[in-house]
């Protein structure tokens, strides 16, 4: 396990090697140095039931029987599922914290619905990204609401 500072340092070293990067997942504990670097943020919000099914499918595909009863990852996976099920209410990190972070970003934030197909969401991301690359640096031109 890496400390918060180690995570940020290692990640910054990796992304500084290229001109562009894609960041995926929650960065709740170490986002600050990266926030000014984002040109576009994508916030995917899925209904609890849909999210839980997808998490279980992804874990099974990635880790196989290791996440099933008797597997070496079973206990940890169950703890993760418990936290994920509480995301909309009192889980940590929770939906409210992520929304507050997204609202504080100096770039456009595209909100996607988990109920939409991956193909539809990809289409929206590509459209938003094309718009961003044609405009000045995101932090220099944003005004008004950023949730779309």
Model-flagged regions — what are they?
Residues 25-26, 46-47, 75, 113-117:
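Short beta->alpha linker loops
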Residues 3-10, 22, 76, 90-94, ...:
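Soluble or luminal CAZymes and related metallo-dependent hydrolases
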Residues 45-94:
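A glycine- and Lys/Arg-enriched "phosphate-lid" helix/loop adjacent to the NTP-binding pocket
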